[in-house]
Amino acid sequence: MKYFWSIVYSFLFLPLFWLAARVFSLFNNKLKAGFKGRKDLFKYLNAKILTLDNSKKNIIIHCASLGEFEQAKPIIDELDKTGKYNFIISFFSPSGFNHSKIDTPLRSKIIKTYLPYDSPPAVNKFIDVTNPAAVIFIKYDLWMNLLKELKSRGIFTMVVNSAFDIRRFKWKFPVSLSYKKSIYDYADVIGVTDEEDKLHFRKLLRGTEREIEVFGDTKYERISKAKEVSSDKALINGKVLTDKNVFVVGSSWDKDDDVIFPVIDKISSNGLSEELSLVTILAPHEPTEDTLEHIEYDIHEKYPHIKSIRYSELNKYAGENLIIIDCIGILMGLYKYAHV
């Protein structure tokens, strides 16, 4: 099945994906930015590689977007302690590439780049230029031709923060599971978040020699560290959160909101919100205007006891129990306010 999926992926899925992305980029600024950022990718990469210490080995850490980059930081910090590596952080999404911030002590050891289109020629050139000793994929953004070429060259690959989400259709449907088995089988090590996920992946990859280990979730390490590090800059006026219990929901999607909003609404309808002095800070994964308007409309139509205000309008705060973050790049700083 591995050969079958390789053919389907390269000759059917990728061309259709590229064509659809090209068409929608005419109307979607994010897709347009992705194509623009990749236009002179290898010229950019060739210049950036020269800034790294060539006596050290290069490690590529691939992140889909900004959230995955934050999850990668504990890994970067640990590997950097050895003093043996440069880091090449690759992104699929423009929001990750544009808004990720490299800590000052690491700037001479890290370069950022877009991941190229997953065609065999582009993948080969990317590996030739970056010359990685290892590649670490954060969570789920796996590209078959890249993994396949890394495998053929004997370059070590690891996927971390892997989660087997049995609630989602693509983790239940036999056809999609067959594809996932093929792509995960190219990785040398799969790091999962807990023992339950380990059992699911062992079942999925039965008959293969993949190493599956429980590493936990680096997201929680990153959040814990962010809470410990105090910031001189106050992101929220102290009066807003004084004597409040703060619940921070980071990088949320629609499915998260569908679970969280009914709970907040019920707590508020029973008067418990005031009794608990509860304020929820919601940071959508992609705080576009469309996303924000959808959230606000959803709240207005379904949850009468939730009163929301955008972060950019906090100067008008009047006791709302939900603060919606409408900008990018401050989530880690918000965790210091969290009680939950």
Pin down the residues of each PLM region.
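Active-site and donor-binding regions of nucleotide-sugar-utilizing enzymes
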Residues: 25-227, 252-254, 267, 271-272, ...
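Acidic donor-binding loop of glycosyltransferase active sites
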Residues: 130-134, 318-340
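Conserved hydrophobic helix-helix packing surfaces used for dimerization/oligomerization
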Residues: 58-59, 135, 247, 280, ...
